[in-house]
């Protein structure tokens, strides 16, 4: 297509002026952007990393993790923090619920001596701390636990029973507008944990909704719905939860996939169990009867023993992990552990299931 040379000259001049005024990279042609390969941080679960499509949660974006009580929301964010710290990144935890257990965090691999932690008095204070940490450019991951606990100052200073219609939603909406650009510039990952509420009078579809208004749904690049699907027992004792995570919104890869994994009490995500399951599903690990073998050598009778073998042999576990990531993240995962949900209606903009 023939382009007017005068227009080309005018465009070059205005682009130069914009870059001089606002900095290099403030405007560019989409196809020329070499920075569009999104940097990610592992969630601690290989199957969830695969379901997300990019290998983890994206840096410079907003992520929302929501679900019922005791479904593993905080555990998942602590696993992300541990993974980020292993890469030498600085992390912060805004504990609005005042419920963070440092002993449990340490068990999950979090370096609590180097984890920044704040227990703010009001929702505005929590979001201002988020913004200040983001603008510093020195913090890589910020977790806010939780949106429901971000109480506006007016509500705290008022009396119980006073009506404060829409205060939290307005506060979140203003914060999202302010934070989104700063997060992109500083390449900081901001994770909001959220709770579920029930909408009154809903006759059709799911009555569930999340707190804090609609702004977070729109600004979030990734929304994860985490649910406990069953209990893991050792004899009569419950030792963990079977967990399912649905990627209900994803702006960095194909959405609507899901991952299933185990969360063991006091240990976190059962990574070796995932490696065994995914290894068998993709023919890296052979299963004959109850026996599991890798490259012709038996590694254990039963899933638990195979997982124990991988725990005791981290080199082999790392080899299986690396091979699975290369297979499934480059070519796309079509296994049952990262399948697309097609039996539900989903709002394509917000990722809301209805």
UniProtKB/Swiss-Prot annotation:
Q: Which Pfam families match?
A: RecA, RecA_C
> Can you say where in the cell this protein is located?
Cytoplasm
Which UniProt keywords are listed? ATP-binding, Cytoplasm, DNA damage, DNA recombination, DNA repair, DNA-binding, Nucleotide-binding, SOS response
An individual GO BP term: DNA recombination
The residues that hold ATP are 67-74
Listed Acidic residues bias regions: 343-354
Q: What is the name of the protein in this document?
A: Protein RecA
